[in-house]
Amino acid sequence: MRKYNSLDKALIIYVKYIVVAFVQSSPNRNKEGIIIIMDKLLDLTRDFDAAKAAFEAYLDEYDRADDKIHLKIVHTYGVVDAAEDIARRMGLGEEDVQLAKVIGLLHDIGRFEQIKRFDSFEPGTMEHAVYGAQLLFGPEKMIRRFVKDDRFDSLICTAIEKHSDFKLEGITDERTLLHAKLIRDADKLDNCRVKLEESMETLLGVDEKGVGEGVIAPKVWESCMAKESVLSSDRVSKVDYWISYIAQYYDINFPETYEIMREHNYVKRIKDRVPYALPETQEKMDILAAEMEKYMDERIRNKK
């Protein structure tokens, strides 16, 4: 995924001066307007850098050496990159790109306290998305540590609060809905990487063999065949969790996200990470992966 670093920022500055030189050579060019646009781009980059610095300071309150904390730190920056990649492929304006990055940076801020208190990612221990929104936008207004401008408070709050909802509902504002969908896609996209790179013990508390020994619950398989995400409460065995990680990709909003997933061959790689003890389980995993890839290709082809 595309990462923007100090060299990219230097390039923006360089381009700014090239543009200035160009418009100065032609009196008919609106050089003031172009310079304002370039300055705005630099301001947006600085805004994200300031938010990132504040986030790093916030992380100092937690044990970075803890495997689950480390996972979520890496995941956070993975979601930032994923949000930017999706947004740029969609052709969104720079303000929306930077806004998507900030939401990605803060989307899981509630996870760190959940891990500190419960050493768990389970939704039954804490609704981390709701908690994160309350933490940022409650009486103390922690959001001001990260974002000085309050124009997007409602949008950011809603996107964070709803990013882990089973179904995205109840948003009427068009731009807020865009970013709520975008963070959900970016979150799922980086979770593909997480499921391949993190140790299975950190993810599910057992090794790959232990995951593959289970039987897929009937309700879980029904959801998979209905092309729906799996309810957390329906999962019984570790293999239920694993198959649910693939089924959740039916709930992707933008074809650009599917394009990235196909480029990385994520679905097959996630399926193949686990050795399934029962032929029936292997067969069902193969069926789901094939159906998922067919669905993804159709969405990409139809661009919707």
Specify the residue positions occupied by each region the protein language model found.
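His-Asp-centered metal-binding catalytic motifs of divalent-metal-dependent phosphohydrolases/nucleases
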Residues: 97-124, 132, 136, 155-166
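Acidic/histidine metal-binding catalytic segments
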Residues: 91-102, 142-161, 175-182
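An active-site-proximal "capping" alpha-helix that borders the catalytic cofactor pocket
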Residues: 78-86, 127-140
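Divalent metal-dependent phosphate-bond-processing catalytic cores, especially two-metal-ion Mg2+/Mn2+ enzymes
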Residues: 39-46, 68-73, 77, 81, ...
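Short, Lys/Arg-enriched N-terminal segments with co-localized hydrophobic residues
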Residues: 19-37
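Active-site flanking loop/helix segments enriched in acidic
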Residues: 52-78, 110-122
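Low-complexity, intrinsically disordered or signal/transmembrane-proximal segments
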Residues: 4, 14-17, 24
